[in-house]
């Protein structure tokens, strides 16, 4: 998939799940499943419940996303 086809959303992590997955509530109120991007894993950036994040999602499946940025609090 080309990077131009991804849709970006902002949200807040509501729950941390096993295996580096998260439940995120988007700014529009929807709740989605998300996982950490490779860059976050490589740099050991911890994502905790309550953190504001930016997600990349495929326009074909808006129930799952990839966290690509954790905003500074």
Swiss-Prot record:
Main location: cytoplasm
Gene Ontology cellular-component terms listed: cytosol
SUPFAM superfamilies xref list: Nucleic acid-binding proteins
Cellular localisation: Cytoplasm
Molecular function terms, GO-annotated: ribosome binding; rRNA binding; translation initiation factor activity
Pfam families to which the protein is assigned, alphabetical: eIF-1a (PF01176)
Domain of life: Bacteria
Domain S1-like: from-to ranges: 1-72
InterPro entries hit by this protein: NA-bd_OB-fold, RNA-binding_domain_S1_IF1, TIF_IF1
Record's keyword terms, sorted: Cytoplasm, Initiation factor, Plasmid, Protein biosynthesis, RNA-binding, rRNA-binding
Family membership: Belongs to the IF-1 family.
Known role: One of the essential components for the initiation of protein synthesis. Stabilizes the binding of IF-2 and IF-3 on the 30S subunit to which N-formylmethionyl-tRNA(fMet) subsequently binds. Helps modulate mRNA selection, yielding the 30S pre-initiation complex (PIC). Upon addition of the 50S ribosomal subunit IF-1, IF-2 and IF-3 are released leaving the mature 70S translation initiation complex.
Quaternary structure note: Component of the 30S ribosomal translation pre-initiation complex which assembles on the 30S ribosome in the order IF-2 and IF-3, IF-1 and N-formylmethionyl-tRNA(fMet); mRNA recruitment can occur at any time during PIC assembly.
Name the UniProt record assigns to this protein: Translation initiation factor IF-1 3
Species whose genome carries this gene: Cupriavidus metallidurans (strain ATCC 43123 / DSM 2839 / NBRC 102507 / CH34)
Gene name linked to the record: infA3
């Amino acid at each position: 998939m080309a990077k131009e086809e991804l849709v970006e959303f902002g949200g807040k992590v509501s729950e941390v799940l096993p295996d580096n997955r998260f439940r995120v509530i988007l700014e529009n109120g929807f709740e989605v499943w998300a996982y950490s991007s490779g860059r976050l894993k490589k740099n050991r950036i911890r994502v905790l419940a309550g953190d504001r994040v930016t997600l990349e999602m495929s326009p074909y499946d808006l129930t799952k996303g990839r966290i690509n940025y954790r905003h500074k609090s």
